[in-house]
């Protein structure tokens, strides 16, 4: 987070696969680059992210942050000439309301990254359900205490 400058641009509705219902992501279309799932109209925060490091591989990213889940269903990556280079779509699956608290967050199910310069796409699929570790409040406090995180400096 500190390696970037963050700028809020606007709020916008986008089409995204926010709650995948199938076991694994499926794709179709020319070169299998389109998700074959139910799209939803999602309210998002549009945020520009620029690296403070000059040698970073890309100039900037536009993140569409879902207002309800805080996941990033779409990310646009621009090269150093400020031309759109890559489009990343992240797919999540939301649990039913009857689940345990540790399973109540949306889980990553896959991602498609389209490289517009190379004219190819990378499809990554989760083959098994995402595991959510269960910790008691006392364990969380011990593991993430500031004194524990800075130990050894």
Predicted regions and their residues:
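Flexible, processing/modification-adjacent segments and terminal tails
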Residues: 1-42, 138-153
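Gly/Pro-enriched, hydrophobic low-complexity segments
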Residues: 1, 40-137
